[in-house]
């Protein structure tokens, strides 16, 4: 067992952090052949609660968990880490759109980007969960000029998993039957859950699910508004499902993608599909021998092109807003 990874988790005492850490320590992201150090970052008032989480982690006696660092100092948290999972963010409350969070979270992610730039290992990769995650990732990336831009990612896997779940339910099939379910653009209510390119048992989803009205209206709106629906029902935002999607994402970014599938992650655009270079945009991706690449040969009908434009326009607006605030 030669492999070892140091992982920073921000917002470690929060609900997503609590749902994430035990699975992370048990090998569910990096594999059963990789030992883990956890660097846990929290704001000062949450440190006592975080110490309780650390006690529980100790009490699990995970064979793969080597060391834990508990701190409120980003420089300590990101020191020599190979992965930074940026989970902590000001919470989204009922009735709140992600744009309202931009200013609130901007200074947090600018500071964390700088701390990662100055303290992390040379091979660090950054994965942003805290919302609005695309633009929080953009802010962190622009405040870490020494780290290659292709090491920054934001999570749209929760949307992908939600979409897979809904297609499986509607088609009456098991979840593994659904593949190539792509999320395009922003992790927000403008995202485009692209059922046109999804497959169910190897056939186009549109051939298996004949209810076009459901696909065009109910399905898309359910996925776009699922986060808000969970908040309304639960009184708090998605936590366990978000943690699960983060683990899925890290696994997919590290391991070779099966030949008949892809996964969605937001990353730094290089002009693919007409997206502005430098925007953090969700694309269909594959990993081959540790190298992540965007699948570029997908064609969109008029409906898909319009949906891509809507989410791209929103991401441009968010970028312009944080530029005006001096955050990038």
Curated annotation (Swiss-Prot):
Primary gene name: mdh
InterPro entries, sorted: L-lactate/malate_DH, Lactate/malate_DH_C, Lactate/malate_DH_N, Lactate_DH/Glyco_Ohase_4_C, Malate_DH_AS, Malate_DH_type2, NAD(P)-bd_dom_sf
Active-site feature positions: 187
Single GO BP term: NADH metabolic process
EC number: 1.1.1.37
Annotated GO MF terms: L-malate dehydrogenase (NAD+) activity
Keywords: NAD, Oxidoreductase, Tricarboxylic acid cycle
Family recorded in the similarity comment: Belongs to the LDH/MDH superfamily. MDH type 2 family.
Binding site for NAD(+): 11-17, 105, 112, 129-131
Keyword Oxidoreductase: yes
Protein name per its UniProtKB record: Malate dehydrogenase
Enzyme class: oxidoreductase
UniProt catalytic activity: (S)-malate + NAD(+) = oxaloacetate + NADH + H(+)
Binding site for substrate: 92, 98, 131, 162
Domain of life assignment: Bacteria
Record's function text: Catalyzes the reversible oxidation of malate to oxaloacetate.
Pfam families tied to this protein: Ldh_1_C, Ldh_1_N
Leader sequence residues: none
């Amino acid at each position: 067992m030669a492999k070892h990874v140091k992982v920073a988790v921000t917002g470690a005492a929060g609900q997503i952090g609590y749902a994430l850490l035990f699975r992370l320590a048990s090998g569910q992201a990096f594999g059963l052949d990789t030992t883990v150090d956890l660097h846990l970052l929290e704001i000062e008032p949450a440190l006592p609660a975080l110490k309780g989480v650390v006690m529980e982690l100790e009490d699990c006696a995970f064979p793969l968990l080597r060391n834990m660092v508990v701190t409120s100092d980003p420089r300590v948290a990101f020191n020599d880490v190979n992965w930074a999972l940026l989970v902590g963010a000001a919470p989204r409350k009922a009735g709140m759109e992600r744009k309202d969070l931009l200013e609130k979270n901007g200074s947090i992610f600018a500071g964390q980007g700088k701390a990662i730039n100055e303290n992390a290992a040379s091979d660090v990769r950054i994965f942003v969960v805290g919302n609005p995650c695309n633009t929080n990732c953009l802010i962190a990336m622009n405040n870490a000029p020494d780290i290659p831009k292709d090491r920054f990612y934001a999570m749209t896997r929760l949307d992908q998993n939600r979409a897979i779940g809904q297609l499986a339910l509607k088609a009456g099939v098991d979840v593994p039957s659904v593949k190539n379910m792509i999320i395009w653009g922003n992790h927000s209510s403008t995202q485009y859950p692209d059922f046109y390119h999804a497959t169910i048992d190897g056939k186009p989803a549109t051939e298996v699910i004949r209810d076009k009205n459901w696909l065009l209206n109910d399905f898309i709106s359910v996925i776009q508004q699922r986060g808000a629906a969970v908040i309304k029902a639960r009184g708090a935002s998605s936590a366990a499902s978000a943690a699960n999607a983060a683990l899925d994402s890290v696994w997919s970014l590290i391991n070779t993608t099966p030949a008949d599938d892809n996964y969605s992650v937001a990353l730094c655009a290089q002009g693919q599909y007409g997206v502005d270079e430098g925007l953090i945009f969700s694309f269909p991706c594959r990993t081959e021998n540790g190298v992540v690449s965007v699948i570029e040969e997908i064609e969109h009908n008029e409906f898909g092109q319009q949906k891509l434009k809507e989410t791209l326009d929103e991401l441009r607006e968010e970028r312009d807003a944080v530029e005006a605030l001096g955050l990038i």
